[in-house]
Amino acid sequence: MSADAPEPGPGQSPGERASGGPEPSGVDLARVALRAAREAARARGDAAQQKKQARRGGLRSGARADGRDPMALGSAINRLITERGWETPAAVGGVMGRWPEIVGADVAKHCVPERYDEDERVLVVRCDSTAWATNLRLLAPTLVARLNEDLGHGSVRMIKVLGPGGPGGPGRRYGPLRAPGSQGPGDTYG
């Protein structure tokens, strides 16, 4: 180097001058970026940690329990339900599966839960006759109290009871057995 040429600064190759030499491009640009990344990693201490892990053979579990240890399937599902906030929908799904135990076998033969609206906290139940629908409407306050005791306070606010020919139901609207001008679904009253 000549005496009048300034020394290259940090991050500059010997061919570059501080007085506005050519910008790095191509392979030189990649080298500059790699050098900057290495310096940043060294400052963070990542390289030392990676070397330790490489010597040990990767991450290992110690003597104490951590989040990576195996767990029972039931525990894993309960953890997933809790993390995602699915407690109420999962509990209501369990209630729909245990419906005969909750309301009794006689009522369960004639009244079936259809769906649960989580936003309004309403359980929709369809009955196979208007008599059973009326019976379930009379039992609704007691049933809501029992469900909230089982699921947690406020899980079910109301039970909506549908008769046999309600919206979306199997009621007959036309056909040879349908009397002109009749209004009911062919049930006990209508």
Curated annotation (Swiss-Prot):
It comes from the Bacteria. Signal peptide: none annotated. Residues 26-35 have a biased composition (Low complexity). Coiled coil: none annotated. Residues 1-70, 163-190 are annotated as: Disordered. Residues 163-172 have a biased composition (Gly residues). InterPro entries: DciA-like (IPR007922), UPF0232_actinobac (IPR023007). Residues 36-45 have a biased composition (Basic and acidic residues). Belongs to the UPF0232 family. This is UPF0232 protein SCO3875.
